[in-house]
């Protein structure tokens, strides 16, 4: 497909790389010539220097022939304006990143009035992910499928779980747990395991289950399942605001540490039930005096990655609470993974994943399209949910006779209200939603999981 992308920052660069690698014709518009030259040299994309809200620039980029238009500049208003002009000049799907909380209640209205196909708010998505983690603190990462009914959950295996030396096929009978282990990260390698795979202490284990069955499994392996009752949040920006709203609605006591007095006033007016502490979050004595040692969750959400890392390491030293760290830059995720920072949340990854998911869904509207996409375990594994629209070589065949591609696991079938971890005798039917975990990148259709 032909894709026009406005904004060559971190998110724009990640999108340009991913979409070009998947074979799309990508044109990037940005006002920074040096940035575009770097993009064009690094990836198979074309760069155009100019303003994305200029009809002349859009025409030069080929907006009339574009299938998808994406605006991810640093300005919400510019993104919306670019999409509006793109819709007027062409006949494409338009996607805008909009981050300001003041627009949060008007997104549906904006979509209808401008004709935008999708609006992405990465800060709101990040807050929702953190909220899930604080409701299920034993997990280090949680992704949701089937409209929230199915969870993909990651945790670190320690001696306390007593699973060292246990084969995966033993888990259902040994622990009376109906879960499916989908991926394991061990010593830097990622494995899509079979039933004979033996777990070891230190493994990063990702499994799939309904919320109720995940809860029961965590109880049996002695991992925390009780939602946190109080949280200390350092950083009162958009994510801190959205997160506090969600936590307060769930009766969690919230303390926000924010250094900007004006922002503190805004937070105090908007979140009267939260305790707003106007102080520098890097003041260690202050954090300790405000009960860091007894807090059940510590969330570092400042705008500076290095500060968030140091704050979390300090909190880890003084608290046994759930730790969550926000990271903006995508380049150092492999290094951060070795620091044991608790749960790490990347808002920019969420934006990329959503847009790639949307683009893949457009490509296969007839057969089976991608409904949900997550890239997990340092971007090395894709977890996808497909909606099956018509019969294919993947349907009507017992799974035991379906020859899946190497390092691909069919994890779950949802059929109406039924959620099933499939066995060899099960079949995929038209109308099903199917969840797949794979080391393969770029799958667009359910048929892609079957060997030719």
Model-derived features with residue positions:
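Cytosolic regulatory regions of ion transport systems
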Residues: 1-452
């Amino acid at each position: 497909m032909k894709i026009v992308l406005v904004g060559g920052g971190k998110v724009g660069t990640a999108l340009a790389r991913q979409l070009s690698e998947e074979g799309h014709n990508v044109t990037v518009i940005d006002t920074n010539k040096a940035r575009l030259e770097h993009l064009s040299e690094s990836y198979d994309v074309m760069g155009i220097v100019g303003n994305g809200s200029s009809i002349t620039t859009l025409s030069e980029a080929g907006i009339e022939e574009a299938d998808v238009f994406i605006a991810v500049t640093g300005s919400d208003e510019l993104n919306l304006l670019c999409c509006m002009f793109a819709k007027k000049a062409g006949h494409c799907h338009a996607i805008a990143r909009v981050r300001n909380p003041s627009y949060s209640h008007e997104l549906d209205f904006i979509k209808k009035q401008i004709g935008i196909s999708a609006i992405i708010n990465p800060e709101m998505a990040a807050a929702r992910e953190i909220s899930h983690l604080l409701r299920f603190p034993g997990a280090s990462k949680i992704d949701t499928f089937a409209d929230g009914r199915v969870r993909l959950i990651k945790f670190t295996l320690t001696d306390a779980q007593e699973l060292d030396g246990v084969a995966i096929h033993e888990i259902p009978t040994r622990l009376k747990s109906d879960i499916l282990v989908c991926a394991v990260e061990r010593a830097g390698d990622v494995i899509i395991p079979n039933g004979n795979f033996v777990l070891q202490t230190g493994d990063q284990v990702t499994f799939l289950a309904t919320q109720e069955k995940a809860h029961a499994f965590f109880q049996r392996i002695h991992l925390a399942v009780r939602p946190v009752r109080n949280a200390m949040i350092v950083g009162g920006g958009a994510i801190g605001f959205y997160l506090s709203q969600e936590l307060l609605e769930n009766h969690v006591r919230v303390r926000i540490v924010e250094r900007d007095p004006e922002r503190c006033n805004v937070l105090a007016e908007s979140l009267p039930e939260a305790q707003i502490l106007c102080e520098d979050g890097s003041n260690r004595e202050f954090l300790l005096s405000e009960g860091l040692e007894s807090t059940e969750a510590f969330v570092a959400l400042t705008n500076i990655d290095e500060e968030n890392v140091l704050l979390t390491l300090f909190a880890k030293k003084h608290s046994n609470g759930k730790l969550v760290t926000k990271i903006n830059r995508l380049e150092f995720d492999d290094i951060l993974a070795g620091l044991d920072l608790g749960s790490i949340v990347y808002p920019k990854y969420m934006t990329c994943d959503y847009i790639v998911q949307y683009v893949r869904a457009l490509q296969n509207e007839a057969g089976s399209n991608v409904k949900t996409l997550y890239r997990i375990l340092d971007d090395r594994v894709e977890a996808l949910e497909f909606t099956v629209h018509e019969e294919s070589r993947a349907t009507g065949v017992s799974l035991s006779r379906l020859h899946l591609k190497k390092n691909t696991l069919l994890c779950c079938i949802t059929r109406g209200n039924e959620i099933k971890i499939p066995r060899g005798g099960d079949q995929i039917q038209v109308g099903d939603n199917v969840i797949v975990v794979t080391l393969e990148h770029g799958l667009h259709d359910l048929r892609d999981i079957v060997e030719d």
